[in-house]
Amino acid sequence: SLVCQIAKLKGHKVIASAGGAEKARFLKDEIGVDAVIDYKATGDDAAALTAALAEAAPDGIDVYFDNVGGGHLEAALNAARPYARFAICGMISMYNAEAPVPGPSNMALIIGKNLRLEGFIVSTHWDMRGDFLKELGAWHSQGKLKWRQTVLEGIASAPDAFIGLFTGANMGKMLVKLA
């Protein structure tokens, strides 16, 4: 949700993807995104996501921040406007796969639409950390940032907390309270 909040604070139209009605409500009602695709309701295959994204962004998308990969990435490639930019930060759709997951079937769109896909790791941009923290701190002080967290009790719950990250069991950050 932080990426969504930063984009909204910078004046952009934001379409978010969430797994479940509660998460979708949080993004829409509390974060203020313009549209939410609840992939647990629509289905998370590329065709269903492409249809949902076309409805939410009929003119296409210019920027895409990807934590999921798979059908989500394929749908975003379909919706991309020429010269769109993609920041690829994660591929959670593949983390639990028992066999290799095929990539999007529409990778040729990267060429045809002149898209720019780039891996995104925070440490690559460490030189911008000070400015980012200053801006983020100001938003926090002004009460402009919202968050949720899921807290499990005791070290014995750490494995469940970790697994829950990959199954969507958390709302916001997953924390384990030790004492």
Question: Predicted segment positions?
Answer:
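Residues forming the Rossmann-fold NAD(P)(H) cofactor-binding site
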Residues: S1
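N-terminal Rossmann NAD(P)H-binding glycine-rich loop of SDR-like oxidoreductase domains
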Residues: C4
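Generic beta-sheet signal
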Residues: S17, Y39, A87-C89, F120, ...
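Glycine-rich phosphate-binding loop and adjacent beta-alpha segment
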Residues: L27, G71-L145, A179
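A structural signal for short, well-ordered beta-strand elements
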Residues: G103, V151-G154
